[in-house]
Regions:
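Core alpha/beta nucleotide-donor-binding catalytic domains of modification enzymes
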Residues: 73, 78-145
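Class I SAM-dependent DNA methyltransferase catalytic core
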Residues: 1-83, 100-101, 113-116
């Protein structure tokens, strides 16, 4: 048997004692969750979005690094000028990876039922119908994963 035990959280943010050792367990911040998934800092931190919505968005999202590698490798098999549309886009993880490979304007549409996630998509990728330009240019540089 192991001489260590699993840490059990008694109450949120409350120290607990285990064999005379004090531990403090805390929740990750939305920024830390974005970084953990490989998103740019502040990706879900847009005006009108609560921390709760940000946690939900990151929890329902995907980790970007492996998808960036897959999309990069797919590119050599696709025709020049390839575009994508996204069903159930969430906060745009696939779309972000796509435009980093294929360029701005190549993720041409998305569909999302969650209103907070839809706001994130419009904020970054824009929405012609609503006159929102988006700021995706800030995120086209590839991070080093």
């Amino acid at each position: 048997m192991h001489d260590q035990q699993a840490v059990i959280l008694r109450e949120r943010y409350q120290p607990m004692e285990d064999n005379n050792n004090d531990y403090v367990v805390r929740r990750l911040t939305p920024l830390e969750c974005e970084r953990l998934q490989g998103f740019p800092d502040g990706w879900t931190d847009i005006p009108g979005t609560s921390d709760t919505a940000q946690y939900k968005q990151m929890g329902n999202s995907l980790a970007l690094p492996q998808w960036q590698i897959i999309i990069d490798n797919m590119a050599k098999y696709l025709p020049d000028g390839a575009t994508m549309g996204g069903l159930f886009s969430g906060v745009g993880g696939f779309e972000l990876c796509w435009v980093r490979t294929h360029g701005k304007g190549t993720a041409i549409w998305s569909s999302e039922i969650d209103k907070a996630a839809e706001r994130v998509m419009k904020y970054h990728f824009g929405c012609e119908e609503e006159g929102i330009k988006g700021d995706i240019e800030k995120y086209l540089d590839r991070p080093k994963f």
